[in-house]
Amino acid sequence: RQRQMCIRDSKRIVGESGMGDRFLRRTFSTFQLTDDNKRAAAAARRYAEGFDAMLPQPGRQEPGRNGLFIAGPPGTGKTHLAAAIANHLIAQGKPVICMTMIDLLERIKRTYSTTGGSESDVLKIYKTVPLLVIDDIGKEPPTEWAISTVYNIINGRYEAYLPTIVTTNYDTEALIDRMTPRESHDSMTARATIDRLMEMCRGITLTGQSWRSR
């Protein structure tokens, strides 16, 4: 019953999955395998196929690093692999939200001027959905509000042992710099957010030539 409520609430507040048509077309079968990315693709597929073991279960040891931190240069397939995992699980009826970092924050901002759910409603969904996929973390505007909101979501999932997948063009130190508010230049919350993600996630690194330049 709790799972059905989560699905219903996420559809009402965020949409079916938050995924646009471009995300929905990205599957493992449409991923272009190369020598540079085949190990990353295999790791992503293993994660999707073994996802049930990533979820916290009553009476079972905490699942440990049950998320993925997918990093690499632009155009190397990070978003495709993250979306392929999401689509694999959605096809099995599992609740998943997959959004860019910018869209995730914009959805929260819309609650300030519309009746489409309150800020707390949206945050609750992001914190409790069985899998949250955040694409392009580090592309959001580096404001105090943005990093505070991102930390709130990541920390909520950390405390609940829920799996989270993020993709980024940056290594951890560059990401901390990108997420540090320009108003204060205080990196404490950005560093705490990335520290949480490093504790929650296994790393997958993509290399090679950008698909977009081929």
What do the PLM-derived regions correspond to, one by one?
Residues 94-95, 128-131, 160-166:
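Loop/turn-to-beta-strand initiation segments
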Residues 14-42:
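Dynamic helix-loop-helix/coil hinge segments at AAA+ ATPase domain boundaries and subdomain interfaces
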Residues 2-7:
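Short, small-residue-biased leader/transition segments that mark boundaries at the very start
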Residues 58-81:
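Walker A/P-loop nucleotide-binding motif
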Residues 40-41, 90, 94-128:
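Short glycine-rich substrate-engagement loop in P-loop NTPases that contacts/grips substrate
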Residues 43-61:
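Pre-Walker A adenine-sensing motif
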